[in-house]
Amino acid sequence: MPGLAAASPAPSDSQEKKPLKPCCACPETKKARDACIIEKGEEHCGHLIEAHKECMRALGFKI
Protein backbone atom coordinates (compact mmCIF):
# COMPACT_ATOMS: atom_id res chain seq x y z
CA MET A 1 0.00 0.00 0.00
CA PRO A 2 2.73 2.57 0.70
CA GLY A 3 3.99 2.16 -2.87
CA LEU A 4 0.54 2.82 -4.24
CA ALA A 5 0.03 6.00 -2.22
CA ALA A 6 3.46 7.32 -3.18
CA ALA A 7 3.00 6.52 -6.87
CA SER A 8 -0.37 8.21 -7.31
CA PRO A 9 0.38 11.83 -6.34
CA ALA A 10 3.65 12.15 -8.25
CA PRO A 11 2.30 11.67 -11.81
CA SER A 12 -0.66 13.99 -11.27
CA ASP A 13 1.61 16.74 -9.90
CA SER A 14 3.96 16.61 -12.87
CA GLN A 15 1.09 16.32 -15.37
CA GLU A 16 -0.61 19.41 -13.94
CA LYS A 17 2.56 21.49 -14.15
CA LYS A 18 3.66 20.53 -17.67
CA PRO A 19 0.65 21.60 -19.75
CA LEU A 20 0.37 25.06 -18.19
CA LYS A 21 -1.18 27.29 -20.81
CA PRO A 22 -0.47 31.02 -21.08
CA CYS A 23 -4.12 31.80 -20.43
CA CYS A 24 -3.95 30.10 -17.02
CA ALA A 25 -0.57 31.39 -15.89
CA CYS A 26 -0.20 34.32 -13.49
CA PRO A 27 -3.90 34.94 -12.82
CA GLU A 28 -3.21 37.68 -10.25
CA THR A 29 -1.11 39.86 -12.52
CA LYS A 30 -3.33 39.11 -15.51
CA LYS A 31 -6.48 40.22 -13.67
CA ALA A 32 -4.87 43.45 -12.44
CA ARG A 33 -3.45 44.21 -15.89
CA ASP A 34 -6.75 43.59 -17.67
CA ALA A 35 -8.75 45.66 -15.18
CA CYS A 36 -6.32 48.56 -15.52
CA ILE A 37 -6.41 48.45 -19.32
CA ILE A 38 -10.22 48.45 -19.35
CA GLU A 39 -10.52 51.27 -16.82
CA LYS A 40 -7.59 53.53 -17.74
CA GLY A 41 -6.30 52.45 -21.14
CA GLU A 42 -3.16 50.55 -22.06
CA GLU A 43 -0.94 53.65 -22.02
CA HIS A 44 -1.51 54.05 -18.25
CA CYS A 45 -0.85 50.43 -17.28
CA GLY A 46 2.73 49.81 -18.36
CA HIS A 47 3.86 48.78 -14.87
CA LEU A 48 1.15 46.10 -14.63
CA ILE A 49 1.81 44.88 -18.16
CA GLU A 50 5.51 44.50 -17.32
CA ALA A 51 4.72 42.73 -14.04
CA HIS A 52 2.60 40.21 -15.94
CA LYS A 53 5.32 39.68 -18.54
CA GLU A 54 7.90 39.09 -15.80
CA CYS A 55 5.63 36.56 -14.11
CA MET A 56 5.11 34.73 -17.42
CA ARG A 57 8.86 34.69 -18.09
CA ALA A 58 9.49 33.29 -14.62
CA LEU A 59 7.22 30.37 -15.51
CA GLY A 60 9.19 29.71 -18.69
CA PHE A 61 7.07 31.49 -21.28
CA LYS A 62 9.00 33.42 -23.93
CA ILE A 63 7.47 36.88 -24.05
Curated annotation (Swiss-Prot):
Pfam families according to UniProt? COX17 (PF05051)
* PROSITE patterns with a match to the protein in the record: CHCH
**What residue spans carry the region label Disordered?**
1-21
Q: Where is the CHCH domain?
A: 23-63
Q: Identify the keywords attached in UniProt to this record, alphabetized.
A: Acetylation, Chaperone, Copper, Cytoplasm, Disulfide bond, Metal-binding, Mitochondrion, Phosphoprotein
Which cysteine residues pair off into disulfide bonds? 26-55, 36-45
Q: Which GO terms describe its cellular component?
A: mitochondrial intermembrane space
Q: Write out the PTM section of this UniProt entry.
A: Acetylation by KAT8 promotes assembly of the mitochondrial respiratory chain complex IV (CIV).
**Molecular function per GO:** copper chaperone activity; cuprous ion binding; enzyme activator activity
- Positions binding Cu cation in this chain are 23-24
**UniProt subcellular location:** Mitochondrion intermembrane space; Cytoplasm
Where are the Phosphoserine residues found in this chain?
A: 14
Positions occupied by motif Cx9C motif 2: 45-55
- Coiled-coil ranges (or none): none
Residue positions, PTM N6-acetyllysine: 18, 30
GO BP of this protein: mitochondrial cytochrome c oxidase assembly; positive regulation of cell population proliferation
What is the residue range of the motif Cx9C motif 1? Answer: 26-36
* Superkingdom of source: Eukaryota
Functional summary from the UniProt entry: Copper metallochaperone essential for the assembly of the mitochondrial respiratory chain complex IV (CIV), also known as cytochrome c oxidase. Binds two copper ions and delivers them to the metallochaperone SCO1 which transports the copper ions to the Cu(A) site on the cytochrome c oxidase subunit II (MT-CO2/COX2).
Q: How does it assemble?
A: Interacts with COA1. Interacts with the chaperone CHCHD4; this is important for correct folding and the formation of disulfide bonds that stabilize the structure.
User: Which family does this protein fall into?
Assistant: Belongs to the COX17 family.
- Give the protein's recorded name: Cytochrome c oxidase copper chaperone
Per the UniProt record, the source organism is: Canis lupus familiaris (Dog)
